[in-house]
A protein has these predicted regions:
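A general structural motif
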Residues: 1, 60-65, 103, 138, ...
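ATP-binding/phosphotransfer module of carbohydrate and carboxylate kinases, centering on a glycine-rich
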Residues: 1-56, 183-345
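Short glycine-aspartate micro-motif
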Residues: 4-8, 63-67, 107, 141-145, ...
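Short, acidic Gly/Pro/Ser/Thr-rich loop/turn segments
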Residues: 14, 73-75, 149-153, 208, ...
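Active-site nucleophile and cofactor-binding loops and adjacent substrate-binding regions
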Residues: 34-35, 84-89, 107-114, 133-136, ...
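Short beta-strand-loop/turn "lid" adjacent to the catalytic site in phosphate-handling enzymes
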Residues: 55-108, 113-126, 143, 296-299
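Short, electropositive alpha-helical surface patch
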Residues: 120-132, 343-345
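Glycine-rich phosphate-binding loop of actin/hexokinase-like ATP-binding domains
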Residues: 129-132, 136-199, 203, 298-299, ...
């Protein structure tokens, strides 16, 4: 029996889960979601969680391992892991956390690395399959996810199990594919010294595309979205501008042409980058489209054009025909990954 404490720690919320592993099955013993802004540091969250566990379970079982996926860079210095959650001011130290939890080792991993491990624990109902393909055992697995930014990672077989390797693929150059995307690139170059694909294929990118189309003065802007975008432009990054644009684009009654064209450009740019990652990895173990945006715009990604653009790679398009491609629907994939990794320590 293995008892694991796992966490998915983001800028606004933290989800902690205590789970028991028997053979390959996990049983959730207790879990709780915390609003990060309500706590001065992570230790306060941890103490409250442990106290709640004791109330719920009668006592806290002896932990076998703990792993926390954190929305920030992880630093490894002489086997000591540290991390910083910038917008909350929280700091993490693996040695200190191990002392607090009375265990030998605590693992800190980047939140997108946690997503990488998480795809190994997903069930069929957690996925929407774009292309069934043919799985080749122990082949590379690719993971890409648009949220606030754009995460990319891959899984490689180490002879015993899969290991996740983080990349900074979201910061590679944006490559426009047509005249309108060239205009978009020129527009963004007025703001930035260089334009990464993350500037387009992300939640921030959705707003940037909207601003580009709005400033061309070719499509009328709706007052509701205009208000949210103006708040975003004034520094309120939690104005939900991107979500409002996506929702309007999918509305059967709204018919917001500006939102619809924004999401068309976003979806096509995202598809092109998914295809780029597929070419670089040849992930015959599967390619997983994760991140917070995909499940929310699933109808747009179910359109056959999304898959067509993924595979539209000219002379080498045929290389992608047999790669299994899935959209991750389970929002707890990062927590699942932290749980799986924690159990392997």
């Amino acid at each position: 029996m293995t008892i694991v404490l796992a966490g998915d720690i983001g800028g606004t919320k933290t989800l902690l889960r205590l789970a028991e592993k028997n053979t390959d099955e996990f049983t959730v013993l207790y879990e709780h979601r915390f609003a990060g802004a309500d706590y001065a540091n992570f230790s306060d969250v941890l103490r409250e969680f442990i106290a709640n566990c004791k109330k719920h379970l009668g006592d806290l079982p002896r932990l076998s391992g703990a792993c926390f996926g954190i929305a920030g860079p992880i630093r490894d210095r002489d086997s000591k892991l540290t991390a910083q959650l910038t917008n909350l001011g929280w700091s993490f130290d693996s040695d200190r956390l191990a002392e607090e939890l009375h265990i030998e080792q605590v693992s800190l991993i980047n939140d997108f690395v946690a997503v990488g491990y998480g795809v190994l624990g997903l069930q069929p109902e957690d996925l929407y399959t774009l292309q069934k393909g043919k799985v080749v055992e122990r082949s590379p697995i690719g993971v890409i996810g648009a949220g606030t930014g754009l995460g990319e990672a891959y899984l490689g077989w180490n002879g015993d199990r899969y290991e996740v390797y983080a990349t900074e693929g979201g910061h590679t150059d944006f490559a426009p594919r047509n005249a309108l995307e060239i205009e978009l690139l020129q527009y963004l170059l007025k703001r930035h010294d260089r334009v990464s694909v993350e500037r387009v294929a992300s939640g921030t990118g959705i707003v940037a595309i909207y601003q580009f189309l709005r400033d061309r003065h070719t499509i009328v802007e709706s007052p509701e979205i205009a208000e949210k975008v103006q708040r975003w432009e004034s520094g309120e990054t939690d104005s939900e501008a991107a979500a409002a644009i996506a929702k309007a684009a999918m509305s059967d009654t709204n018919g917001d042409r500006l939102a619809m064209q924004t999401m068309q450009i976003f979806v096509e740019a995202y598809a092109a980058e998914v295809g780029n990652l597929a070419l670089k990895l040849i992930p015959n173990g599967g390619l997983y489209i994760a991140g917070g945006i995909a499940p929310k715009i699933l109808p747009l990604l179910q359109d056959e054009k999304f898959l067509q653009i993924i595979k539209n790679k000219g002379r080498v398009s045929g290389v992608l025909e047999d790669i299994p491609i899935h959209i991750v629907l389970n929002p707890e994939v990062g927590l699942i990954g932290a749980m799986l990794h924690g159990a392997s320590l």
